[in-house]
A protein has these predicted regions:
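Amphipathic alpha-helical scaffolding segments comprising HEAT/armadillo-like alpha-solenoid repeats
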Residues: 3, 24-37, 60-73, 95-103
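Conserved hydrophobic register position within alpha-solenoid helical repeats
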Residues: 18, 48-51, 85
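Charged, compositionally biased N-terminal leader segments and the immediate start
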Residues: 1-11
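Ordered, amphipathic secondary-structure segments that act as subunit-interaction surfaces
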Residues: 78-99
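Structural signature of alpha-helical solenoid repeat scaffolds
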Residues: 10-11, 53, 90-91
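Short inter-helical turns and helix N-cap capping residues of alpha-solenoid HEAT/ARM repeat scaffolds
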Residues: 40-42, 77-79
């Protein structure tokens, strides 16, 4: 999926489960969701954060390759993104991502 296509979907403000399902079906979606959280100035980043959080609850192992980037979001200037990561990262630990903290 292309970034602009995903942005269009996120602007629809569907339930986060809808966007998590996109990530389950197409693994190119997950890094795009993270990129949107890292770079997007508009409110669409919140939909991306909710989708990543849902993935961390249901299939956290899918996020392990992106652990460094997710930890980096703890330094976001946006408090909602920071708080979202505080809810997301424990799922990675449960999925065996304990080594992401040592990097």
């Amino acid at each position: 999926m292309e970034r602009e296509q995903l942005m269009t979907e996120l602007r629809k403000k569907e339930d986060s489960k809808v966007y998590a399902e996109l990530g389950y079906r197409d693994d190119s979606v997950i890094p795009l969701l993270i990129e949107i959280m890292e770079t997007e100035k508009t409110a669409v980043k919140y939909q991306a954060e909710k989708a990543v959080r849902k993935i961390s609850e249901e299939r956290p192992a899918m996020l392990l390759p992106y652990g460094d980037r997710l930890i980096g979001l703890l330094d976001s200037e946006n408090n909602f993104i920071k708080w979202g990561m505080l809810l997301t990262l424990p799922g990675l630990l449960e999925a065996g991502g304990r080594d992401i903290w040592g990097k």
